[in-house]
Amino acid sequence: MEADLVVGAVLVPGAKAPKLVTNALVAKMKPGSVLVDVAIDQGGCFEDSHATTHADPTFKVHESLFYCVANMPGAVPATSTYALANATIGYALAIANKGWEKAIGEDPSLGYGLNVHDGQIRYAAVAKAHNL
């Protein structure tokens, strides 16, 4: 395997990430390869992944280095908060100004963010992930 860097960024909304890189594949990688599992908050997409911290971010598997820090944006909290606020402020204002029902009626994409309503889980993938 010739990769110096492998970034796993798999997202299945509401579900655990599938394991796409096996231990056997990592064993074939060249020494010093780095694997970054961005999907670690959803369980990780590398077979050997386990959540690490900003204080102790890496571990070795065979001769490769894994970086599996949960909540990676936490390394740059001011920047990540600014980015998240900019990405979500329009939705928040629509809900605040119109109420959630009218806001969803006018912008159906907001409905994809409705996970729980009236005591029921409304998002099938979340219910399935939690066996509910």
Language-model region placement:
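Rossmann-like adenosine-cofactor binding region
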Residues: M1-E63
